[in-house]
């Protein structure tokens, strides 16, 4: 019964008639636009919804999607993957991370390759599983390779808190959490007219944690409307409609479409936990985008005893590594190209043999185009 009720709930947000009604409303309002608009979705979940339900086909020619760096696996630069690989190859280490990381290629191979060579690499759904792994392997160091935007950062913070509270001696952290607003600012700059970002569909799960307040600056300082939008197709179409209406009415505002989950302030308890254990890095390098100031997190200095980057500093590679010369993942992550613009898309680069990270992750734009490409 519970599953049926849940299905009925989802059905409301996937209702074809409602989607069609929003498509008609968008088309009607779009006739009043003074120029075409490009809307960037900053969330990989949005990209997959857009592709899965063929939403580009429902939009008029003067309303266009630009795909952003909304996938935490995709934006991880190769040198960070190399860190994971090197750590995994240590005899006394069990490397633990989230599942999408398994096939992401570094310069020496992926974690899947490391596992094939005998490394103990484990993939979990929750960081808290590290506690059990550490308890069952007291002679090994369990290193949690933490990834994700604001959405998953609180879960890592909870694990840090438990490790300290329980005095677990054999869990370390390699922190790769990144934050969304800083890279949005970076993406606005230095764009040609064709790829200009006119508005953002704000990510939903990120905003549950951080609140919509983190986007205040975009309408005020950059004249870019932001509508925080849910994952379902009805959500996406309503969010697009709200953006188009802002342009028609010559407004530039922060709005929340996803009001059933998101509010302005966000989860204050989660934010406090993040603040307690993490601080901003001066610089974090994003794949394809480059160095973005204050966009990455690290453990606070007082927790250096748990920081794998410090403890293993002497063996971790320092060189920045660029993508394969035929891979345009970086250009796609900046919203300056789409997957089908890549010459190796669907041929040399497929989910079974990924060349770039955008084809690896379940949230990657290339994976979405490969899976649902016939719909657009």
List where the protein language model places each region.
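Metallocofactor- and cofactor-centric catalytic cores in central/energy metabolism, strongly enriched
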Residues: 2-139, 153, 157, 161-166, ...
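Active-site-adjacent beta-strand anchor residues
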Residues: 124, 145, 229-230
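A conserved active-site cap/scaffold subdomain adjacent to cofactor or substrate pockets
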Residues: 174, 193-264
């Amino acid at each position: 019964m519970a599953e049926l009720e849940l299905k009925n709930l989802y059905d409301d947000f996937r209702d074809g008639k409602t989607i069609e009604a929003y498509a008609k409303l968008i088309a009607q309002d779009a006739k009043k636009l003074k120029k075409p608009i490009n809307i960037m979705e900053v969330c990989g979940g949005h990209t997959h919804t857009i592709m899965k339900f063929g939403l580009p086909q429902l939009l008029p020619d003067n309303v266009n999607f630009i795909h952003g760096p909304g996938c935490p696996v995709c934006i991880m630069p190769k040198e960070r993957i190399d860190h994971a690989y090197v750590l995994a190859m240590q005899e006394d280490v069990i490397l633990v991370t989230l599942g999408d990381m398994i096939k992401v290629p570094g310069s020496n191979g992926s974690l899947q390759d490391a596992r094939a060579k005998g490394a103990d690499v484990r993939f979990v759904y929750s960081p808290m599983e590290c506690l059990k792994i550490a308890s069952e392997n007291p002679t090994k160091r369990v290193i949690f390779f933490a990834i994700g935007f604001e959405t998953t950062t609180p879960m890592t913070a909870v694990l840090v808190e438990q490790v300290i509270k329980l005095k677990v001696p054999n869990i370390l952290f390699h922190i790769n959490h990144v934050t969304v607003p800083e890279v949005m600012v970076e993406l606005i700059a230095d764009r040609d007219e064709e790829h200009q970002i006119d508005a953002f569909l704000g990510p939903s799960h990120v905003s549950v944690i951080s609140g919509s307040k983190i986007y205040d600056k975009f309408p005020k300082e950059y004249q870019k409307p932001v509508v925080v939008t849910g994952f379902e197709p009805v959500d996406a179409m309503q969010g697009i409609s709200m953006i188009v209406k802002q342009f028609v009415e010559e407004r530039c505002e922060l709005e929340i479409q996803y009001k059933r989950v998101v509010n302005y302030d966000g989860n204050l308890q989660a934010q406090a936990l993040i603040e307690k254990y993490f601080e901003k890095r001066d610089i974090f390098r994003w794949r394809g985008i480059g160095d973005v100031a204050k966009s990455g997190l690290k453990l606070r200095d007082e927790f250096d005893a748990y920081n794998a980057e410090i403890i293993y500093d002497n063996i971790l590679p320092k060189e920045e590594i660029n993508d394969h010369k035929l891979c345009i993942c970086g250009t796609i992550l900046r919203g300056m190209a789409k997957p089908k613009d890549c010459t190796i898309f669907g041929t040399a680069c497929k989910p079974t043999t990924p060349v770039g990270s955008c084809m690896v992750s379940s949230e990657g734009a290339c994976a979405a185009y490969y899976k649902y490409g016939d719909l657009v």
